[in-house]
Amino acid sequence: MSRSAIQVAKAATYLPDLVEVQRSSFKWFLDKGLIEELDNFSPITDYTGKLELHFIGAEYKLKRPRHDVEEAKRRDATFASQMYVTCRLVNKETGEIKEQEVFIGELPLMTERGTFIINGAERVIVNQIVRSPGVYFKDEQDKNGRRTYNASVIPNRGAWLKFETDKNDLLHVRVDKTRKINAHVLMRAMGLSDNDVIDKLRHPEFYKKSIDAANEEGISSEDQALLELYKKLRPGEPPSVSGGQQLLQTRFFDPKRYDLGRVGRYKINKKLRLTIPDNLRTLTNEDVLSTLDYLINLELDVGGATLDDIDHLGNRRVRSVGELLQNQVRVGLNRLERIIKERMTVGETDSLTPAQLVNPKPLVAAIKEFFGSSQLSQFMDQTNPLAELTHKRRISALGPGGLTRERAGFAVRDIHPSHYGRLCPIETPEGPNAGLINSLATHARVNEYGFIETPFWKVENGRLIKEGDPIYLSADLEDECRVAPGDVATNEEGKIMAELVPVRYRQDFETVSPEQVDYVQLSPVQVISVAASLIPFLEHDDANRALMGSNMQRQAVPLLRPERPLVGTGLETQVARDSGMVPISKVNGTVSYVDANAIVVTDDEGNDHTHYLQKYQRSNQDTCLNHRPIVFNGDPVIVGQVLADGSACEGGEIALGQNVLIAYMPWEGYNYEDAILVSERLVKDDLYTSVHIEKYEIEARQTKLGPEEITREIPNVSEENLGNLDEMGIIRIGAYVESGDILVGKVTPKGESDQPPEEKLLRAIFGEKARDVRDNSLRVPSTERGRVVDVRIYTREQGDELPPGANMVVRVYVAQRRKIQVGDKMAGRHGNKGIISRILPREDMPYLPDGTPVDICLNPLGVPSRMNVGQVFELLMGWAASNLDCRVKIVPFDEMYGPEMSNQTVQAYLKEAAKQPGKSWVYNPKDPGKLLLKDGRTGEPFDQPVAVGYAHFLKLVHLVDDKIHARSTGPYSLVTQQPLGGKAQQGGQRLGEMEVWALEAYGAAYTLQELLTVKSDDMQGRNEALNSIVKGKPIPRPGTPESFKVLMRELQSLGLDIGVYTDDGKEVDLMQDVNPRRSTPSRPTYESLGKEYEE
């Protein structure tokens, strides 16, 4: 036990701030990005050139937001600040200058936890990974198997320029994937003479052929070249020299149209070894000539020219919030520029002011569109703190300017050697997005150019130097170094002990002596993402299962009484703290006041800092957000200390599930195929009970016939059903509601047309106007029940912003406690998931030698084929820890402490546990890790010893309550007349192609017929069948399904004369059953078809 897992937890270096990616990017946008855009955008001159409008970007101001974060959530508002910028209008003729502060729009602000609040909902802007601008060299094989090379110059925005060689060794160029142009034609058009070009090239003899080809085509002067260029780029228009000149100028040399960006300029300078200054963001002649030179070197295979790998992380960069927002602001400002120019031309020059010129609408619209409907602006996943944190660290290759799922090949999705320590190789979704959506590794950070860096310790002469901050390297720099893994063994002085060290060098593995090592990885965890790093014994799990494990931790529902894991990895505290779900002390000081709603910390100067707590708020995923204080009055606290537990936290650590006693043994077939057998204790002791808060809302609208009214007086509803409503007709807080109960009473005025004939008759006789309204109340949907925890009323008078046409909106929040039940999904942390198949009484569960019944029985066959052995290690380590009454932290990849370390550590702990008084039965050396269990029903021992222990098990958000669903009569699809699908639409169960095959194979012809006709879309048949069932008559024969008729009509609409005929040659009329009065068939009523049958 000398260097054991205990020390591993100490070695778990503290991670950097995990949401830094979002925060620093937004800070850059406020400090630099926005100013950059405003400056690029001014001055704007009108078409005559006598008026100029300057934006003074550096002096922009943000006003304090109208609502704070909580208020914005409550009012469904956006947490945003108004932007004002100083504008200067210069009249060139009179020399007059007008200066004014102008409102240019609202900018949503980021909250402290890295999210945005848009219309009351928390949203996250996901980081996007795109191809970096720069120059790329590729090779392609033509159909004869000959290699040709090409070079593409890719800007941040603007036209692509692609140089390529062909089989005759001629150089061509394409602009934006148009037709090929001889490369020398472009050179001449750019005003370069033959000698200018030849002097720049290291192997001009290769280029001479292209010059000759250009001369043969009769293009020998700059003017001819420009004409030729214009013809190729704008075919069909009359070419002119000035047109060609302007075309070339705007396409590549105008900073408004063509921009390499800082990154593009940096990458081109680096690849082509140029020294062009950073602020020159357009193409230069030097760029083009160097690219040609490099391409020729590639073709001749000289001069150390290398091809580029576009999937290398040195060639892909991350665009975070700041940059995405900056691009959006640019779009808005470009639209604004057009408007300003028009207004300058139209308006009276003398009386114009900057405020009249600048219209904030286009900019507001662009920003709103980005936050509201961009693919990268996502509704935050708030199921638990880990889900929230991972969502903010997600990196997506999809989105505007990125890839699409369909076009992304295998290479883009694959793990690349440069991902090491930057993107997690494990955490990615299953299915069509696999490999396109990644997660940032734990220690990775994004540098100023948008490339992902990862930290290393420097090694000098075989000695590790751990002084100061570690050194961050981006992927292309790391390729040139020899890097040893983070788990190399070192002695006290930091000297590497091994004679030979495995290193990574230029994306290959080598073994070198310690003196040759340049860097060592910071920590073994730095390769994987936050979610994966919470899995203990991760190194013993197959990657596919580890992937499921890290994805399922994000779906764990916060439980009523969370319990932190017995076996953890040491990162739990940091995850809870950085997720933003727990309140953190802002100062050093002492706690001066604590209650359920607020904690006050008094700092050393005597100032009070109040931290407000969330009580039973609803999260985006309907789970419950709640804070419980964990500090007491008088406690000293330091900056960054956790003051209260959030949901799924205990003691400031993340606690997603419960530690339960698990046995790996089959039990009467109840855990066949990943099913799970659980004990009643989990239900009785509320171990897996969670609180879910559902939101119901109703709006009273203004209709043509008058306003809808929220009231207690509802027609045809008995007084007892109104018992829980207050005098306004809104449910009282604290009431318990079942499905079908009224939450908010609402009546809608109904027109004359809505009345049935008998009502009209009564009206004619008595002449009095009955209260002509119809009940339109908000009721609890089927399968839902719970207690009303909050009611919010929004009206115009209070100044709330309501949707157009609404007079009042009422929101009711209903909370329910859900105990675990058959059909719920549970999972461990190693991708071992299953559905509960049966809940057994405690006394029937198998029990341990000391009489403790186990909580869960899992199938042992779930382990070998899936190769996630980590669960067995966790089980036994948890067993030892619970018997020793301690908790264990084990960082993944513990081999640096010796071979087979996990095994040794677990064994050592189990032996230690068996030494406790009265615990000798805990560990049996003959059968290590197994115990002889007895059957709870008979008391007989089972045949074989069974692996038993404690593991951290989660309840996932896929709850059976949300999925179970039944339909009797419900809505039908309009065209096919088949029942809709899905729970939300009250849908039916789909009888698909394969189910039809099963019935066909069985020969169940009549069952199949009625499933395809009267139970689905034979309109006439289903109404008649309903009629006959109600009246107890025999069910008539099914007719033609509507979908068949639709098919026939579609074929007819193609102009095919197609019909259906009976045996005796009579044509069947497919249109006969459509009632001419009602084009949309209503739900069937008992008499809805006038056809009565002969008795």
Swiss-Prot record:
Q: What are the alphabetically sorted keywords of the record? A: DNA-directed RNA polymerase, Nucleotidyltransferase, Transcription, Transferase
A Pfam family reported for this protein in Swiss-Prot or TrEMBL: RNA_pol_Rpb2_6
Q: Might you give the EC number(s) for this enzyme? A: 2.7.7.6
Show the stretches that span the lipid bilayer. none
Q: NCBIfam families this protein is in?
A: PRK00405.1, rpoB
Q: Which GO terms describe its cellular component?
A: DNA-directed RNA polymerase complex
- Region feature (Disordered): 1069-1095
Task: Tell me where on the tree of life, at the top rank, the source sits.
Answer: Bacteria
A GO BP annotation: DNA-templated transcription
Q: What is this protein called?
A: DNA-directed RNA polymerase subunit beta
Q: Which residues form the signal peptide?
A: none
A GO MF term: DNA-directed RNA polymerase activity
- Keyword Glycoprotein assigned to the entry: answer is no
Subunit structure, briefly? In cyanobacteria the RNAP catalytic core is composed of 2 alpha, 1 beta, 1 beta', 1 gamma and 1 omega subunit. When a sigma factor is associated with the core the holoenzyme is formed, which can initiate transcription.
Which organism encodes this protein? Answer: Prochlorococcus marinus (strain NATL1A)
Q: What does this protein do?
A: DNA-dependent RNA polymerase catalyzes the transcription of DNA into RNA using the four ribonucleoside triphosphates as substrates.
Q: Which reaction does it catalyse?
A: RNA(n) + a ribonucleoside 5'-triphosphate = RNA(n+1) + diphosphate
Q: Which family does it belong to?
A: Belongs to the RNA polymerase beta chain family.
- Give the EC class as a word: transferase
